[in-house]
Protein backbone atom coordinates (compact mmCIF):
# COMPACT_ATOMS: atom_id res chain seq x y z
CA UNK A 1 0.00 0.00 0.00
CA UNK A 2 1.41 3.39 -0.98
CA UNK A 3 2.20 6.05 1.60
CA UNK A 4 -0.47 8.38 0.19
CA UNK A 5 -3.19 5.93 1.24
CA UNK A 6 -2.42 6.57 4.91
CA UNK A 7 -3.45 9.70 6.79
CA UNK A 8 0.11 10.14 8.02
CA UNK A 9 3.13 8.71 6.21
CA UNK A 10 5.72 6.53 7.95
CA UNK A 11 8.09 9.51 7.91
CA UNK A 12 5.52 11.73 9.61
CA UNK A 13 4.82 9.11 12.28
CA UNK A 14 8.54 8.88 13.04
CA UNK A 15 8.63 12.67 13.43
CA UNK A 16 5.72 12.48 15.87
CA UNK A 17 7.62 9.97 18.00
CA UNK A 18 10.74 12.18 17.92
CA UNK A 19 8.76 14.91 19.68
CA UNK A 20 8.05 12.53 22.57
CA UNK A 21 11.76 11.58 22.57
CA UNK A 22 12.69 15.25 22.89
CA UNK A 23 14.63 15.48 19.62
CA UNK A 24 12.02 17.52 17.75
CA UNK A 25 9.89 20.51 18.75
CA UNK A 26 6.09 20.52 18.60
CA UNK A 27 4.45 23.43 16.78
CA UNK A 28 1.94 24.41 19.46
CA UNK A 29 1.74 23.86 23.20
CA UNK A 30 -1.52 24.48 25.05
CA UNK A 31 -0.11 24.91 28.54
CA UNK A 32 -2.03 24.51 31.81
CA UNK A 33 -5.23 23.59 30.01
CA UNK A 34 -8.36 22.47 31.82
CA UNK A 35 -9.68 20.09 29.19
CA UNK A 36 -12.60 17.70 28.81
CA UNK A 37 -11.35 14.13 28.97
CA UNK A 38 -13.96 12.34 26.89
CA UNK A 39 -13.05 8.90 28.26
CA UNK A 40 -12.99 9.61 31.97
CA UNK A 41 -15.77 12.21 31.52
CA UNK A 42 -13.97 14.68 33.76
CA UNK A 43 -12.38 18.11 33.48
CA UNK A 44 -8.64 17.56 33.90
CA UNK A 45 -5.43 19.61 33.92
CA UNK A 46 -2.89 18.89 31.18
CA UNK A 47 -0.43 20.23 28.65
CA UNK A 48 -1.44 19.53 25.05
CA UNK A 49 1.26 19.20 22.40
CA UNK A 50 0.41 19.72 18.73
CA UNK A 51 2.53 19.03 15.65
CA UNK A 52 1.14 19.92 12.23
CA UNK A 53 -2.45 18.60 12.32
CA UNK A 54 -2.06 16.06 15.14
CA UNK A 55 -2.22 15.96 18.92
CA UNK A 56 1.10 14.40 19.96
CA UNK A 57 0.69 14.20 23.73
CA UNK A 58 -1.77 15.08 26.49
CA UNK A 59 -0.50 14.99 30.07
CA UNK A 60 1.61 16.59 32.77
CA UNK A 61 4.93 16.71 30.88
CA UNK A 62 6.29 19.63 28.91
CA UNK A 63 8.25 19.20 25.65
CA UNK A 64 12.04 19.21 25.86
CA UNK A 65 12.31 21.10 22.56
CA UNK A 66 10.43 24.38 22.19
CA UNK A 67 12.49 26.23 19.55
CA UNK A 68 9.75 25.85 16.88
CA UNK A 69 6.84 25.94 19.31
CA UNK A 70 4.13 28.52 19.93
CA UNK A 71 3.24 28.39 23.64
CA UNK A 72 -0.34 29.31 24.58
CA UNK A 73 -1.11 29.72 28.27
CA UNK A 74 -4.59 28.27 28.81
CA UNK A 75 -4.74 28.96 32.53
CA UNK A 76 -8.35 29.82 33.40
CA UNK A 77 -9.63 28.58 30.03
CA UNK A 78 -11.52 25.40 29.16
CA UNK A 79 -10.51 23.22 26.23
CA UNK A 80 -12.95 20.87 24.47
CA UNK A 81 -12.93 18.82 21.26
CA UNK A 82 -14.22 20.83 18.33
CA UNK A 83 -17.80 20.04 17.39
CA UNK A 84 -19.03 17.72 14.63
CA UNK A 85 -22.09 18.24 12.39
CA UNK A 86 -23.13 14.68 11.43
CA UNK A 87 -25.90 15.56 8.98
CA UNK A 88 -25.05 18.56 6.78
CA UNK A 89 -26.75 19.48 3.51
CA UNK A 90 -24.00 21.90 2.46
CA UNK A 91 -25.73 23.37 -0.60
CA UNK A 92 -28.56 25.35 1.01
CA UNK A 93 -27.68 28.55 -0.91
CA UNK A 94 -24.21 28.48 0.71
CA UNK A 95 -21.55 26.08 -0.52
CA UNK A 96 -19.64 23.50 1.55
CA UNK A 97 -16.58 25.71 1.98
CA UNK A 98 -18.39 28.89 2.98
CA UNK A 99 -20.55 26.91 5.40
CA UNK A 100 -17.46 25.34 6.97
CA UNK A 101 -15.61 28.66 7.22
CA UNK A 102 -18.55 30.23 9.03
CA UNK A 103 -19.29 27.31 11.34
CA UNK A 104 -15.63 26.97 12.35
CA UNK A 105 -15.86 30.43 13.94
CA UNK A 106 -18.38 28.89 16.35
CA UNK A 107 -16.41 25.70 16.99
CA UNK A 108 -17.81 23.20 14.45
CA UNK A 109 -14.87 21.93 12.41
CA UNK A 110 -16.02 18.51 11.15
CA UNK A 111 -18.91 17.92 8.74
CA UNK A 112 -20.57 14.78 7.39
CA UNK A 113 -22.18 15.96 4.16
CA UNK A 114 -24.99 14.94 1.81
CA UNK A 115 -23.77 14.01 -1.69
CA UNK A 116 -27.12 14.49 -3.45
CA UNK A 117 -26.32 17.75 -5.26
CA UNK A 118 -23.01 16.34 -6.48
CA UNK A 119 -24.78 13.15 -7.55
CA UNK A 120 -27.35 15.13 -9.56
CA UNK A 121 -25.01 17.60 -11.24
CA UNK A 122 -21.51 16.12 -11.65
CA UNK A 123 -19.98 12.96 -13.03
CA UNK A 124 -18.55 10.62 -10.43
CA UNK A 125 -14.92 11.43 -11.35
CA UNK A 126 -15.67 15.16 -11.02
CA UNK A 127 -17.34 14.61 -7.65
CA UNK A 128 -14.43 12.56 -6.36
CA UNK A 129 -11.97 15.24 -7.50
CA UNK A 130 -14.00 17.74 -5.48
CA UNK A 131 -13.94 15.44 -2.44
CA UNK A 132 -10.15 15.32 -2.75
CA UNK A 133 -10.01 19.13 -2.93
CA UNK A 134 -11.97 19.37 0.30
CA UNK A 135 -9.26 17.46 2.15
CA UNK A 136 -7.04 20.53 1.68
CA UNK A 137 -9.15 22.94 3.74
CA UNK A 138 -8.92 23.28 7.56
CA UNK A 139 -12.35 21.73 8.11
CA UNK A 140 -12.62 17.94 8.14
CA UNK A 141 -15.10 17.00 5.40
CA UNK A 142 -16.81 13.62 5.14
CA UNK A 143 -19.78 12.52 3.05
CA UNK A 144 -22.79 10.24 2.74
CA UNK A 145 -24.12 8.39 -0.26
CA UNK A 146 -27.77 8.73 -1.23
CA UNK A 147 -29.76 5.74 -2.42
CA UNK A 148 -32.61 7.83 -3.91
CA UNK A 149 -33.32 11.36 -5.11
CA UNK A 150 -36.23 12.16 -2.73
CA UNK A 151 -38.38 13.00 -5.78
CA UNK A 152 -39.74 11.32 -8.90
CA UNK A 153 -36.88 11.50 -11.43
CA UNK A 154 -36.83 11.23 -15.20
CA UNK A 155 -33.54 9.34 -15.07
CA UNK A 156 -33.77 7.97 -11.53
CA UNK A 157 -32.83 4.40 -12.37
CA UNK A 158 -29.84 5.45 -14.48
CA UNK A 159 -28.63 7.84 -11.77
CA UNK A 160 -29.11 5.54 -8.79
CA UNK A 161 -27.60 2.29 -10.07
CA UNK A 162 -25.46 -0.28 -8.29
CA UNK A 163 -22.22 0.66 -10.04
CA UNK A 164 -22.49 4.32 -8.99
CA UNK A 165 -23.71 3.60 -5.46
CA UNK A 166 -21.03 0.99 -4.70
CA UNK A 167 -18.23 3.25 -5.99
CA UNK A 168 -19.44 6.03 -3.73
CA UNK A 169 -19.76 3.73 -0.73
CA UNK A 170 -16.21 2.50 -1.24
CA UNK A 171 -14.76 6.02 -1.15
CA UNK A 172 -12.75 6.52 2.04
CA UNK A 173 -14.38 9.89 2.78
CA UNK A 174 -17.90 8.40 2.61
CA UNK A 175 -19.00 7.28 6.07
CA UNK A 176 -22.60 6.22 5.53
CA UNK A 177 -25.42 5.38 3.17
CA UNK A 178 -28.72 7.24 3.13
CA UNK A 179 -30.57 9.16 4.31
CA UNK A 180 -33.34 6.71 3.45
CA UNK A 181 -35.99 9.10 2.14
CA UNK A 182 -37.35 6.23 0.00
CA UNK A 183 -37.70 3.88 2.97
CA UNK A 184 -41.20 2.69 1.87
CA UNK A 185 -39.57 1.17 -1.24
CA UNK A 186 -36.99 -0.55 0.95
CA UNK A 187 -39.68 -1.85 3.27
CA UNK A 188 -41.92 -3.06 0.46
CA UNK A 189 -39.49 -5.19 -1.48
CA UNK A 190 -36.82 -3.09 -3.25
CA UNK A 191 -34.01 -5.66 -3.08
CA UNK A 192 -31.56 -3.50 -5.00
CA UNK A 193 -31.74 -0.86 -2.29
CA UNK A 194 -31.49 -3.56 0.37
CA UNK A 195 -28.33 -4.82 -1.34
CA UNK A 196 -26.88 -1.31 -1.09
CA UNK A 197 -27.70 -1.27 2.62
CA UNK A 198 -26.04 -4.67 2.98
CA UNK A 199 -22.96 -3.44 1.12
CA UNK A 200 -22.78 -0.39 3.38
CA UNK A 201 -22.80 -2.65 6.42
CA UNK A 202 -20.22 -4.97 4.87
CA UNK A 203 -17.94 -1.95 4.49
CA UNK A 204 -18.54 -1.26 8.21
CA UNK A 205 -20.21 2.05 7.47
CA UNK A 206 -23.48 3.44 8.82
CA UNK A 207 -26.98 3.75 7.37
CA UNK A 208 -29.00 6.88 8.17
CA UNK A 209 -32.79 6.75 8.27
CA UNK A 210 -35.46 9.31 7.46
CA UNK A 211 -38.52 8.07 9.32
CA UNK A 212 -40.87 10.90 10.35
CA UNK A 213 -43.91 9.58 12.20
CA UNK A 214 -42.79 5.95 11.92
CA UNK A 215 -44.56 3.46 14.20
CA UNK A 216 -42.71 1.20 16.59
CA UNK A 217 -43.23 -1.74 14.20
CA UNK A 218 -41.88 0.24 11.24
CA UNK A 219 -38.85 1.33 13.24
CA UNK A 220 -38.20 -2.27 14.25
CA UNK A 221 -38.45 -3.51 10.65
CA UNK A 222 -36.11 -0.82 9.34
CA UNK A 223 -33.63 -1.61 12.11
CA UNK A 224 -33.72 -5.25 11.04
CA UNK A 225 -33.03 -4.17 7.45
CA UNK A 226 -29.89 -2.35 8.56
CA UNK A 227 -30.60 1.23 9.61
CA UNK A 228 -28.40 2.59 12.42
CA UNK A 229 -29.60 6.11 13.20
CA UNK A 230 -32.55 8.42 12.59
CA UNK A 231 -32.90 12.20 12.93
CA UNK A 232 -36.68 12.59 12.47
CA UNK A 233 -37.93 12.33 16.07
CA UNK A 234 -40.13 15.34 16.86
CA UNK A 235 -41.07 14.46 20.44
CA UNK A 236 -39.31 12.92 23.39
CA UNK A 237 -41.49 9.82 23.07
CA UNK A 238 -40.47 9.39 19.41
CA UNK A 239 -36.80 9.77 20.36
CA UNK A 240 -37.19 7.20 23.12
CA UNK A 241 -38.98 4.81 20.72
CA UNK A 242 -35.94 4.93 18.44
CA UNK A 243 -33.60 4.35 21.36
CA UNK A 244 -35.68 1.37 22.49
CA UNK A 245 -35.34 -0.21 19.03
CA UNK A 246 -31.56 0.07 19.19
CA UNK A 247 -31.01 3.21 17.13
CA UNK A 248 -28.56 5.98 17.76
CA UNK A 249 -30.81 9.04 17.98
CA UNK A 250 -29.89 12.28 16.27
CA UNK A 251 -31.64 15.16 18.00
CA UNK A 252 -32.50 17.84 15.46
CA UNK A 253 -32.78 21.60 15.64
CA UNK A 254 -33.27 23.09 12.19
CA UNK A 255 -34.88 26.10 10.57
CA UNK A 256 -38.03 24.10 9.74
CA UNK A 257 -37.88 21.69 12.70
CA UNK A 258 -36.58 23.65 15.73
CA UNK A 259 -37.40 20.74 18.03
CA UNK A 260 -34.45 20.50 20.41
CA UNK A 261 -35.96 22.23 23.45
CA UNK A 262 -39.07 20.03 23.29
CA UNK A 263 -37.03 16.86 22.68
CA UNK A 264 -34.73 17.47 25.66
CA UNK A 265 -37.52 18.57 28.01
CA UNK A 266 -39.60 15.49 27.22
CA UNK A 267 -36.65 13.07 27.35
CA UNK A 268 -35.80 14.35 30.83
CA UNK A 269 -39.46 14.04 31.87
CA UNK A 270 -39.42 10.45 30.57
CA UNK A 271 -36.56 9.73 32.96
CA UNK A 272 -33.71 9.45 30.46
CA UNK A 273 -30.40 9.86 32.28
CA UNK A 274 -27.95 8.26 29.84
CA UNK A 275 -27.11 10.30 26.72
CA UNK A 276 -24.27 8.42 25.06
CA UNK A 277 -26.59 7.19 22.26
CA UNK A 278 -27.76 10.73 21.43
CA UNK A 279 -26.11 13.15 19.01
CA UNK A 280 -26.93 16.63 17.69
CA UNK A 281 -27.69 17.86 14.15
CA UNK A 282 -28.96 21.06 12.50
CA UNK A 283 -30.01 19.09 9.37
CA UNK A 284 -29.00 21.51 6.62
CA UNK A 285 -30.72 24.73 7.62
CA UNK A 286 -30.68 27.88 5.52
CA UNK A 287 -28.07 30.63 6.06
CA UNK A 288 -29.84 32.96 8.49
CA UNK A 289 -30.48 30.09 10.91
CA UNK A 290 -26.70 29.91 11.37
CA UNK A 291 -26.17 33.61 12.05
CA UNK A 292 -25.11 32.91 15.65
CA UNK A 293 -23.48 29.57 14.99
CA UNK A 294 -24.28 25.92 14.53
CA UNK A 295 -23.63 23.15 17.05
CA UNK A 296 -22.71 25.65 19.77
CA UNK A 297 -26.36 26.72 19.95
CA UNK A 298 -27.48 23.13 20.51
CA UNK A 299 -24.93 22.63 23.30
CA UNK A 300 -26.05 25.86 24.98
CA UNK A 301 -29.70 24.79 24.69
CA UNK A 302 -28.93 21.40 26.23
CA UNK A 303 -27.11 22.97 29.17
CA UNK A 304 -29.98 25.44 29.68
CA UNK A 305 -32.49 22.57 29.67
CA UNK A 306 -30.63 20.69 32.41
CA UNK A 307 -28.54 18.19 30.45
CA UNK A 308 -25.25 17.60 32.32
CA UNK A 309 -22.56 19.86 30.82
CA UNK A 310 -20.23 17.00 29.87
CA UNK A 311 -23.07 15.12 28.16
CA UNK A 312 -23.93 18.26 26.17
CA UNK A 313 -20.37 18.45 24.81
CA UNK A 314 -20.17 14.69 24.23
CA UNK A 315 -23.34 14.76 22.08
CA UNK A 316 -21.59 17.30 19.85
CA UNK A 317 -18.26 15.51 19.56
CA UNK A 318 -17.25 12.19 21.12
CA UNK A 319 -20.61 10.42 20.72
CA UNK A 320 -20.63 11.27 17.01
CA UNK A 321 -17.03 10.21 16.42
CA UNK A 322 -17.56 6.91 18.22
CA UNK A 323 -20.76 6.21 16.31
CA UNK A 324 -19.05 6.75 12.94
CA UNK A 325 -16.06 4.57 13.89
CA UNK A 326 -13.66 7.51 13.70
CA UNK A 327 -13.01 7.97 17.39
CA UNK A 328 -9.33 7.21 16.73
CA UNK A 329 -8.98 10.58 14.94
CA UNK A 330 -11.97 12.72 16.02
CA UNK A 331 -14.11 13.59 19.00
CA UNK A 332 -11.58 13.69 21.82
CA UNK A 333 -8.57 15.59 23.06
CA UNK A 334 -6.16 12.68 23.27
CA UNK A 335 -2.85 11.54 21.85
CA UNK A 336 -3.00 10.70 18.15
CA UNK A 337 -6.18 12.61 17.32
CA UNK A 338 -6.49 15.32 14.70
CA UNK A 339 -5.93 18.68 16.40
CA UNK A 340 -9.48 20.06 16.25
CA UNK A 341 -9.71 22.02 19.48
CA UNK A 342 -11.95 24.74 20.94
CA UNK A 343 -10.78 27.07 23.70
CA UNK A 344 -13.64 28.41 25.84
CA UNK A 345 -13.98 31.17 28.41
CA UNK A 346 -16.36 29.05 30.47
CA UNK A 347 -17.84 25.55 30.44
CA UNK A 348 -21.33 26.97 30.11
CA UNK A 349 -20.55 29.04 27.01
CA UNK A 350 -19.79 26.76 24.04
CA UNK A 351 -18.87 29.64 21.70
CA UNK A 352 -15.06 29.38 21.58
CA UNK A 353 -12.78 32.40 21.76
CA UNK A 354 -10.17 30.42 19.82
CA UNK A 355 -10.45 27.47 17.43
CA UNK A 356 -7.77 25.14 16.08
CA UNK A 357 -8.71 23.06 13.01
CA UNK A 358 -6.23 20.48 11.73
CA UNK A 359 -3.62 22.20 13.87
CA UNK A 360 -4.23 25.65 12.33
CA UNK A 361 -5.69 28.68 14.04
CA UNK A 362 -8.98 29.53 12.35
CA UNK A 363 -10.03 31.80 15.20
CA UNK A 364 -7.68 33.45 17.68
CA UNK A 365 -8.83 35.49 20.66
CA UNK A 366 -12.13 36.25 19.00
CA UNK A 367 -10.66 37.15 15.60
CA UNK A 368 -11.30 35.17 12.41
CA UNK A 369 -7.87 34.11 11.17
CA UNK A 370 -9.11 32.05 8.23
CA UNK A 371 -11.20 33.89 5.66
CA UNK A 372 -9.41 32.59 2.57
CA UNK A 373 -11.20 30.30 0.12
CA UNK A 374 -9.25 27.41 -1.39
CA UNK A 375 -11.69 25.62 -3.68
CA UNK A 376 -11.38 26.53 -7.38
CA UNK A 377 -14.90 25.57 -8.37
CA UNK A 378 -14.41 25.97 -12.12
CA UNK A 379 -11.63 23.36 -12.10
CA UNK A 380 -14.11 21.00 -10.47
CA UNK A 381 -16.69 21.56 -13.25
CA UNK A 382 -18.85 23.57 -10.85
CA UNK A 383 -19.82 26.48 -13.09
CA UNK A 384 -22.70 28.95 -13.61
CA UNK A 385 -25.97 27.58 -14.90
CA UNK A 386 -26.32 27.94 -18.65
CA UNK A 387 -29.95 28.00 -19.81
CA UNK A 388 -29.83 27.73 -23.59
CA UNK A 389 -33.58 28.13 -23.89
CA UNK A 390 -36.36 30.52 -23.00
CA UNK A 391 -40.07 30.52 -22.25
CA UNK A 392 -42.82 32.31 -24.10
CA UNK A 393 -46.01 33.86 -22.82
CA UNK A 394 -47.80 30.98 -24.56
CA UNK A 395 -46.05 28.55 -22.17
CA UNK A 396 -47.77 30.26 -19.26
CA UNK A 397 -51.22 28.79 -19.75
CA UNK A 398 -52.99 27.60 -16.60
CA UNK A 399 -56.13 25.54 -16.95
CA UNK A 400 -55.93 22.67 -14.43
CA UNK A 401 -57.51 23.92 -11.21
CA UNK A 402 -56.06 21.18 -9.02
CA UNK A 403 -53.12 22.70 -7.19
CA UNK A 404 -50.88 22.71 -4.12
CA UNK A 405 -52.10 24.10 -0.79
CA UNK A 406 -49.12 25.04 1.39
CA UNK A 407 -49.85 24.24 5.06
CA UNK A 408 -46.51 25.25 6.59
CA UNK A 409 -42.97 25.77 5.31
CA UNK A 410 -42.97 22.43 3.49
CA UNK A 411 -46.12 20.32 4.06
CA UNK A 412 -48.78 20.50 1.35
CA UNK A 413 -52.16 19.04 0.41
CA UNK A 414 -54.16 19.03 -2.83
CA UNK A 415 -56.84 21.67 -3.34
CA UNK A 416 -59.09 22.87 -6.13
CA UNK A 417 -58.92 26.55 -7.04
CA UNK A 418 -62.24 28.35 -7.31
CA UNK A 419 -60.91 31.55 -8.87
CA UNK A 420 -60.33 32.43 -12.51
CA UNK A 421 -56.78 31.39 -13.44
CA UNK A 422 -57.16 31.96 -17.19
CA UNK A 423 -55.64 35.44 -16.95
CA UNK A 424 -52.31 37.29 -16.89
CA UNK A 425 -52.58 38.44 -13.29
CA UNK A 426 -54.26 36.93 -10.24
CA UNK A 427 -56.15 39.08 -7.76
CA UNK A 428 -54.41 40.02 -4.51
CA UNK A 429 -57.69 39.29 -2.73
CA UNK A 430 -56.68 35.61 -2.71
CA UNK A 431 -53.52 33.88 -1.48
CA UNK A 432 -53.16 31.93 -4.72
CA UNK A 433 -50.29 32.15 -7.20
CA UNK A 434 -49.28 30.67 -10.52
CA UNK A 435 -46.63 27.96 -10.12
CA UNK A 436 -44.43 26.52 -12.85
CA UNK A 437 -41.65 23.97 -12.81
CA UNK A 438 -39.57 23.97 -15.99
CA UNK A 439 -36.97 21.34 -16.86
CA UNK A 440 -33.40 22.48 -16.39
CA UNK A 441 -32.79 21.59 -20.06
CA UNK A 442 -35.96 23.35 -21.25
CA UNK A 443 -37.72 20.24 -22.54
CA UNK A 444 -40.90 20.28 -20.43
CA UNK A 445 -42.98 22.29 -18.01
CA UNK A 446 -45.61 21.63 -15.36
CA UNK A 447 -48.11 24.45 -14.73
CA UNK A 448 -50.26 24.53 -11.62
CA UNK A 449 -51.38 26.87 -8.85
CA UNK A 450 -50.29 27.19 -5.24
CA UNK A 451 -52.38 28.44 -2.33
CA UNK A 452 -50.82 29.81 0.86
CA UNK A 453 -47.49 30.97 -0.60
CA UNK A 454 -48.16 34.73 -0.89
CA UNK A 455 -50.90 37.28 -1.61
CA UNK A 456 -49.06 40.15 -3.30
CA UNK A 457 -45.89 38.83 -4.93
CA UNK A 458 -45.30 39.85 -8.56
CA UNK A 459 -42.95 37.07 -9.59
CA UNK A 460 -40.23 34.87 -8.15
CA UNK A 461 -37.86 32.68 -10.15
CA UNK A 462 -35.46 30.16 -8.65
CA UNK A 463 -32.88 27.79 -10.06
CA UNK A 464 -32.49 26.59 -6.47
CA UNK A 465 -34.84 23.62 -6.24
CA UNK A 466 -34.90 20.03 -5.10
CA UNK A 467 -34.20 18.69 -8.59
CA UNK A 468 -32.18 21.52 -10.14
CA UNK A 469 -35.13 22.44 -12.35
CA UNK A 470 -36.51 25.99 -12.54
CA UNK A 471 -39.34 27.17 -10.29
CA UNK A 472 -41.49 30.20 -11.16
CA UNK A 473 -44.17 31.45 -8.78
CA UNK A 474 -46.16 34.65 -8.69
CA UNK A 475 -49.32 36.64 -9.26
CA UNK A 476 -48.25 38.34 -12.46
CA UNK A 477 -46.90 36.51 -15.51
CA UNK A 478 -44.84 39.50 -16.71
CA UNK A 479 -43.03 39.63 -13.37
CA UNK A 480 -42.44 35.88 -13.44
CA UNK A 481 -40.82 36.29 -16.87
CA UNK A 482 -38.73 39.24 -15.65
CA UNK A 483 -37.43 37.16 -12.74
CA UNK A 484 -36.74 34.20 -15.03
CA UNK A 485 -34.72 36.29 -17.51
CA UNK A 486 -32.66 37.67 -14.62
CA UNK A 487 -31.69 34.21 -13.32
CA UNK A 488 -30.57 33.38 -16.87
CA UNK A 489 -28.32 36.46 -16.83
CA UNK A 490 -26.95 35.58 -13.39
CA UNK A 491 -26.15 31.98 -14.29
CA UNK A 492 -28.53 30.88 -11.58
CA UNK A 493 -30.17 32.45 -8.57
CA UNK A 494 -33.30 33.44 -6.71
CA UNK A 495 -34.94 36.61 -8.03
CA UNK A 496 -38.01 38.57 -6.95
CA UNK A 497 -39.52 40.90 -9.56
CA UNK A 498 -42.24 43.50 -9.23
CA UNK A 499 -43.72 45.82 -11.87
CA UNK A 500 -41.31 44.41 -14.48
CA UNK A 501 -38.24 45.29 -12.39
CA UNK A 502 -35.94 43.19 -10.23
CA UNK A 503 -36.71 43.86 -6.57
CA UNK A 504 -34.14 41.53 -4.98
CA UNK A 505 -31.77 38.81 -6.09
CA UNK A 506 -29.43 36.19 -4.68
CA UNK A 507 -26.92 35.12 -7.32
CA UNK A 508 -26.17 31.38 -7.27
CA UNK A 509 -23.35 30.99 -9.82
CA UNK A 510 -22.30 27.53 -8.62
CA UNK A 511 -24.57 25.16 -10.60
CA UNK A 512 -27.47 27.56 -10.08
CA UNK A 513 -27.69 26.22 -6.53
CA UNK A 514 -24.90 27.74 -4.43
CA UNK A 515 -23.56 31.21 -3.73
CA UNK A 516 -19.91 32.23 -3.63
CA UNK A 517 -20.59 34.91 -1.02
CA UNK A 518 -19.21 34.76 2.50
CA UNK A 519 -21.82 33.44 4.86
CA UNK A 520 -22.24 36.80 6.64
CA UNK A 521 -23.14 38.50 3.33
CA UNK A 522 -25.39 35.65 2.22
CA UNK A 523 -27.26 35.72 5.54
CA UNK A 524 -28.19 39.37 4.98
CA UNK A 525 -29.38 38.67 1.43
CA UNK A 526 -31.50 35.74 2.57
CA UNK A 527 -32.99 37.74 5.45
CA UNK A 528 -33.96 40.51 3.02
CA UNK A 529 -35.59 37.96 0.71
CA UNK A 530 -37.59 36.50 3.61
CA UNK A 531 -38.70 39.97 4.75
CA UNK A 532 -39.80 40.98 1.24
CA UNK A 533 -41.82 37.79 0.83
CA UNK A 534 -43.38 38.10 4.29
CA UNK A 535 -44.38 41.68 3.47
CA UNK A 536 -46.15 40.21 0.42
CA UNK A 537 -48.09 37.60 2.33
CA UNK A 538 -45.72 34.68 2.92
CA UNK A 539 -46.70 33.64 6.45
CA UNK A 540 -43.95 31.12 7.24
CA UNK A 541 -40.25 31.60 7.98
CA UNK A 542 -38.25 29.67 5.37
CA UNK A 543 -39.29 30.30 1.75
CA UNK A 544 -36.09 28.72 0.43
CA UNK A 545 -37.18 25.41 1.98
CA UNK A 546 -40.68 25.85 0.55
CA UNK A 547 -39.20 26.21 -2.94
CA UNK A 548 -36.64 23.44 -2.40
CA UNK A 549 -39.33 20.97 -1.34
CA UNK A 550 -42.02 21.71 -3.95
CA UNK A 551 -40.66 18.57 -5.66
CA UNK A 552 -39.92 16.48 -2.55
CA UNK A 553 -41.98 13.29 -2.77
CA UNK A 554 -40.70 12.07 0.62
CA UNK A 555 -43.06 14.64 2.17
CA UNK A 556 -46.89 14.73 2.05
CA UNK A 557 -49.11 15.17 0.09
CA UNK A 558 -48.79 16.73 -3.38
CA UNK A 559 -45.64 17.72 -5.29
CA UNK A 560 -44.57 19.05 -8.66
CA UNK A 561 -42.13 16.69 -10.43
CA UNK A 562 -40.84 15.76 -13.88
CA UNK A 563 -43.72 13.28 -14.26
CA UNK A 564 -46.20 16.04 -13.47
CA UNK A 565 -48.28 17.18 -10.53
CA UNK A 566 -47.94 14.12 -8.30
CA UNK A 567 -50.19 12.86 -5.49
CA UNK A 568 -47.75 11.30 -3.03
CA UNK A 569 -50.30 9.22 -1.13
CA UNK A 570 -51.93 7.59 -4.16
CA UNK A 571 -48.84 7.61 -6.37
CA UNK A 572 -50.94 9.06 -9.19
CA UNK A 573 -50.17 11.88 -11.61
CA UNK A 574 -52.78 14.64 -11.31
CA UNK A 575 -51.53 16.70 -14.28
CA UNK A 576 -48.89 15.67 -16.82
CA UNK A 577 -46.01 17.83 -18.04
CA UNK A 578 -46.08 19.35 -21.51
CA UNK A 579 -43.35 20.50 -23.90
CA UNK A 580 -42.36 24.14 -24.17
CA UNK A 581 -43.74 25.96 -27.21
CA UNK A 582 -40.23 26.33 -28.64
CA UNK A 583 -37.83 23.39 -28.45
CA UNK A 584 -34.15 24.35 -28.38
Curated annotation (Swiss-Prot):
<keyword id="KW-0378">Hydrolase</keyword>
<dbReference type="GO" id="GO:0000034">
    <property type="term" value="F:adenine deaminase activity"/>
</dbReference>
<dbReference type="InterPro" id="IPR011059">
    <property type="entry name" value="Metal-dep_hydrolase_composite"/>
</dbReference>
<dbReference type="InterPro" id="IPR032466">
    <property type="entry name" value="Metal_Hydrolase"/>
</dbReference>
<dbReference type="Pfam" id="PF01979">
    <property type="entry name" value="Amidohydro_1"/>
</dbReference>
<dbReference type="Pfam" id="PF13382">
    <property type="entry name" value="Adenine_deam_C"/>
</dbReference>
<comment type="similarity">
    <text>Belongs to the metallo-dependent hydrolases superfamily. Adenine deaminase family.</text>
</comment>
<protein>
    <recommendedName>
        <fullName>Putative adenine deaminase BA_3032/GBAA_3032/BAS2818</fullName>
        <ecNumber>3.5.4.2</ecNumber>
    </recommendedName>
</protein>
<dbReference type="InterPro" id="IPR026912">
    <property type="entry name" value="Adenine_deam_C"/>
</dbReference>
<dbReference type="InterPro" id="IPR006680">
    <property type="entry name" value="Amidohydro-rel"/>
</dbReference>
